[in-house]
Amino acid sequence: MVSDVWHNLTVPHTASRGPGRPPAAKAAETRERIIGAAREVFSELGYDAATFQAIAIRADLTRPAINHYFANKQVLWREVVQQTNAVIVNAGRSRAQDETKLLARLSAYFTAAMQADSEDRSAAAFLVTSVLEAQRHPELSDEEHDSLKHAREFVAWAVNDAIARGELTTDTEVDSLVEMLVAVMWGMGFYAGFVGSHQELKAVVRQFELLMSNNLWRLQS
């Protein structure tokens, strides 16, 4: 008995881990909850009005919990930008590169960027918000994860490749065409994130495809 007591006093106690997910998995899950909540709050309120308290409430966490994972609002903003670009913009580029025609490439990229296939388009809303906030707050701009810059680069690549393959004429004004398509994309992105329903967006994308293929209307001779 005495030896048992002495053993218990001298041997460090190893805490038994209860049932449930391991701490690392829970930490990753909490981090994702924060990022998802921040994406929604930033989109709804803008960068200036968004607070850690509002994000904590949306994530069903405490404000100190947000601070535990992200030192300040700018750090959290950059993380949301990075993740949103990785999921949406990169996916759009990947899908588009599987296509061979300009219209199919643009449609694939636009559909992915606007989350037209999803009922939840919070990421599309945030992409638009991130472009606006980068104009208001240049310090928030991150060239590596600049969705406007990436969109412009993709459209320029698609247009130039279409010219090289003979799909567009060689006298095409590339710069103005690229800017027009980028403007259309972000206008549709705003509609996707803040205005239209899922079904309405799908119809808009379809009308865009008809317009670009010159099949939206036919003039009577």
Show where each model-derived region lies.
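Hydrophobic alpha-helical connector segments
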Residues: 79, 90-123, 174-181, 205, ...
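N-terminal intrinsically disordered/low-complexity leader segments
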Residues: 1-29, 219-221
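Short, basic, alpha-helical segments at the C-terminal edge of helix-turn-helix-like DNA-binding modules
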Residues: 82-88
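Amphipathic alpha-helical segments used for helix-helix packing
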Residues: 104-105, 118-142
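Short coil/turn segments at alpha/beta junctions that flank glycine-rich nucleotide-binding fingerprints
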Residues: 44-48, 99, 120, 165
